[in-house]
Amino acid sequence: MKIKSVMTLAAATALLAGGAMAQSGAQSGDWRTVSPENLWVIDTAKGRVLVELEPRVAPNHIERIRTLTNQGFYDGLKFHRVIPNFMAQTGDPQGTGAGGSELPDLKGEFTFRRGRDSGFAPVENSGAGLRGVMGSIPIVTQPDAQMFVTADFKTSAQGLFCPGVAGMARAGSPDSANSQFFLMTGQNDNLNGGYTVFGRVVQGLDVVRALKAGDEAQDGAVGPDADAMTRARLASAMPEAERPTIRVAVPGSAPFNAAVEAARAEKGASFNICDVQPPVQGG
């Protein structure tokens, strides 16, 4: 299961302001608390990584992640393929990239339907579609105006493979994802639309970037001394006193917009949606 290698922005923002926000977790003002059932706690040899799962984007893959996590399947598995500025891959009990669980493979969830209550905030309007953030996930989507001419009053959207994004690895078939997943440490547009996005690292991206890297000549294969997931749990399965609490800035809020403008100022003409990391509190 190796990874192979229109409306104006202002008008869209005005439309979005009229919709309710259906977020993953409790929301208070500018901040949203990630629900414990959607907070994936991955302890590694290099530290802790917290991933927000996004069921609105890939419900079947989220169900698989939860099932395997609750079984203890991921505990002790190595990050067998790590390529700097690209991704770190794990989830194979064989540690080779060819293994998986005994559960059946999953049908790809490369796109999803987005409603006006999704809480999407546009950030970039270049090329085809609006690019912005929903929850903590970077996505590209059709504008809200398209919802008025669809039977379900929704529009199509697709997750983007930016730094921190969690995706499912697969073999050649688009419907062959099983247990392996990867955490992005860089941007790779070639994966967009061909692999399932299911979440994003909201804390610990520095930990992912510190994992032992593989040999470039061996396509990132790390070998027997690879770093491992010592334990993977859902926050909801942890004793309440031990649960990490993460609050993410709501897309379109003041702290979110400040982060966008800071990234835009730093990157200048090269700015794109992958430069935006939603601000986070807690841990």
Regions found by a protein language model. Give the residues of each.
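Bacterial N-terminal signal peptides
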Residues: T8-A17
